[in-house]
Amino acid sequence: MPVSDGRGLDRFIAFPYDHYRDDPLWVPQLRRDMRTLLTPGKNPFFEHAEAQYWTARRADGRTVGRIGAIKNDMHNKEHNDRVGFYGFFESIDDQAVANALFDTAAAWLRTKGFDTMRGPMSPSVNDECGLLIANNGTPPSLMMPYNFPYYQALHERYGFAKAKDLLAFDGGGAQMAPERFVRLAQRAGERRGIKLRTLDMKRFDAEVELIKALYNSAWEKNWGLCR
């Protein structure tokens, strides 16, 4: 069923809370944050993008899956392709349910002129993206995807093929950076005239533009980047 009102969006947001309720590793996102992420007018992403969301429901009304289809105009302008995206995918371990969700998203993307569907992107490469296919028994990290192991099979049986390996590195949060690395960083900064300073709130807009420029420069060779 397409999400067409606030009640439908509430159901879309609520499904993972039921889906993962017995998984001790799952860390829920705040519902308020999810609503902001999904809503045009609240998320600046939708200044250059469009999305449609659906939930899958049994005859008894029980929700068994969800998906979103995303049209990212900035991506297609920058990369000159016809790639549409899907994201926010969740499903019970039932291939028929997953297929129906994938088919629905693909059909919507075809109406927008796309010939390729890529994901999960929730909703973009700057947010949660990719599918967890290894180390499912470890706690999830911030902005990293988390899903049941059977999701890989649902995708492969549908016919998806890998577009890119996405890697997450565990730095051991309780560990301090090795002293040698700290010394090297300090020397490099001194040689290049780099200084660390606090944010100047009196020049907030200029500081935001500077951070944006630094971010884009650091990530310009990252796969799928949209500036």
Task: Tell where the protein language model's regions lie, with residue ranges.
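A short acidic/small-residue loop/turn micro-motif
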Residues: 71-73
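Conserved beta-hairpin
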Residues: 50-67, 156-158, 162-165
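Short low-complexity, flexible loop/linker segments enriched in glycine and/or proline
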Residues: 37, 132-135, 178-180
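Short amphipathic alpha-helix that is part of the acyltransferase structural core
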Residues: 1-41, 82-85, 190-227
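Acyl-donor binding region in acyl/amide transferases
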Residues: 76-164, 222-225
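Acyltransferase donor/substrate-recognition loop-hinge adjacent to the catalytic core
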Residues: 145-224
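A short helix-loop-beta-strand connector motif used in the catalytic cores of GNAT acetyltransferases and
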Residues: 39-55
